[in-house]
From Swiss-Prot:
InterPro entries: Disintegrin_CS, Disintegrin_dom, Disintegrin_dom_sf, MetalloPept_cat_dom_sf, Peptidase_M12B, Reprolysin_adamalysin. Zn(2+) binds at residues 35, 39, 45. This is Disintegrin metalloproteinase/disintegrin echistatin. Its EC number is 3.4.24.-. Residues 1-95 form the Peptidase M12B domain. A motif (Cell attachment site) lies at residues 154-156. It comes from Echis carinatus sochureki. SUPFAM superfamilies: Blood coagulation inhibitor (disintegrin), Metalloproteases ('zincins'), catalytic domain. It is found in: Secreted. Residues 103-177 form the Disintegrin domain. GO terms for molecular function: metal ion binding; metalloendopeptidase activity; toxin activity.
Length: 186
């Protein structure tokens, strides 16, 4: 059992549908939801002349359990007419990020639970006044002061220090010989 406004998808007061279904079959609930959303998208109940190639179509007046999982040719035409005649802007226009109600996003389009507070999730750029996001020489979105130890010495090695200009831990230029690809690092 359900109800929805016909062609109400882009009307803030009518973009709604209600479904009450006590079925334990999830597909049946999904079909009922698709049926009501079909009304929101300008689709009427299918008549006898409509065909979806199955036992029953999503917009049939009476759903035939889980077999009603396709929209009919009539429904597809009605949806196309809805788009052409009513030009529903909430469907045809790509919304601005500030117009959507959703989880904030970042570089990978998902904001992780441990999302970085240094970045604005709407722009994926550092927040104003922030210098860095992470690294051994970054704390609370700011570079650590020059001279802060970022890597303790081991053996005959020397401490490495932050330079106050980067989030990375630069290698101490006064270190003894170390090899990388056979060359001496200075």
């Amino acid at each position: 059992i359900g109800i929805a406004y016909n062609r109400g998808m882009c009307d803030p007061k009518k973009s709604v549908g209600t479904v009450m279904d006590h079925s334990t079959e999830h597909l049946s609930v999904a079909v009922a939801m698709a049926h009501e959303m079909g009304h929101n998208l300008g689709m009427d109940h299918d008549g006898n002349q409509c065909n979806c190639g199955g036992a029953g179509c999503v917009m049939s007046e009476e759903l035939i359990e889980s077999r009603s999982y396709k929209f009919s040719d009539c429904s597809k035409n009605q949806y196309q007419n809805y788009l052409t005649i009513y030009k529903p802007q909430c469907i045809l226009n790509q919304p601005l990020r500030t117009d959507t109600v959703s989880t904030p996003v970042s570089g990978n389009e998902l904001l992780q639970n441990s999302a970085n507070p240094c970045y604005d999730p709407l722009t994926c750029h550092p927040r104003e006044g922030e210098q860095c996001e992470s690294g051994p020489c970054c704390r609370n979105c700011k570079f650590l002061k020059e001279g802060t130890i970022c890597k303790r010495a081991r053996g005959d090695d020397m401490d490495d220090y932050c330079n106050g200009k980067t989030c990375d831990c630069p290698r101490n230029p006064h270190k003894g010989p170390a090899t990388a690809k056979g060359s001496v690092l200075m």
